[in-house]
Amino acid sequence: MMKKIDVKIVDPRVGQQFPLPTYATPGSAGLDLRACLDQAIELKAGETTLIPTGLAIHIADTGLAAVILPRSGLGHKHGVVLGNLVGLIDSDYQGQLMVSVWNRGQQTFTVEPGERIAQMVFVPVVQAEFNLVEDFVSSERGEGGFGHSGRS
């Protein structure tokens, strides 16, 4: 299913010097977000910084949200992940997309202008209305918590 989302370019290099986000393959769930930087920045081990993407989006559909996720290669090969682990973009947000990048690795990592630093996935949203009850209808699991369902 394809859904149109309003995108505003807030840095004129996006679409010129830096490509617009696209799906890499027909089966891709995520769009890559790029570092919209004037010059490379060095992220020392343990440091976190906020990186602009040069884009603002307005989803405008309360049935959708976007999540910003780490790119698997950056995390696995370099220890570079998101500072907030997952970013949530609400449907009514209209500001620039910023990516909190955290170097949890042991080596300094250089983020180059235009480098793909995160990915954005659009997800359906269900807003819940709470129904207060005294007790729940019994289930097989009940109150079993962490690890209760086993490993095999």
Curated annotation (Swiss-Prot):
What's one Pfam family here?
dUTPase
UniProt xrefs under SUPFAM superfamilies: dUTPase-like (SSF51283)
Q: Catalytic activity, per the record?
A: dUTP + H2O = dUMP + diphosphate + H(+)
Domain of life of the source: Bacteria
Record keywords, A-Z: Hydrolase, Magnesium, Metal-binding, Nucleotide metabolism
Q: Which cofactor does it need?
A: Mg(2+)
Q: Which InterPro entries match?
A: dUTPase, dUTPase-like, dUTPase-like_sf, dUTPase_trimeric
For the ligand (substrate), the binding residues are 71-73, 84, 88-90, 98
Annotated S-S bridges: none
Q: What is its EC number?
A: 3.6.1.23
A GO molecular-function term, please? magnesium ion binding
Enzyme class, UniProt record, top EC level? hydrolase
- PANTHER family according to UniProt: DEOXYURIDINE 5'-TRIPHOSPHATE NUCLEOTIDOHYDROLASE
* Role of this protein: This enzyme is involved in nucleotide metabolism: it produces dUMP, the immediate precursor of thymidine nucleotides and it decreases the intracellular concentration of dUTP so that uracil cannot be incorporated into DNA.
Q: What is the similarity comment for this entry?
A: Belongs to the dUTPase family.
Q: In its UniProt entry, what is this protein called?
A: Deoxyuridine 5'-triphosphate nucleotidohydrolase
The organism named in the record is: Pectobacterium carotovorum subsp. carotovorum (strain PC1)
Its taxonomic placement starts with:
Bacteria, Pseudomonadati, Pseudomonadota, Gammaproteobacteria, Enterobacterales
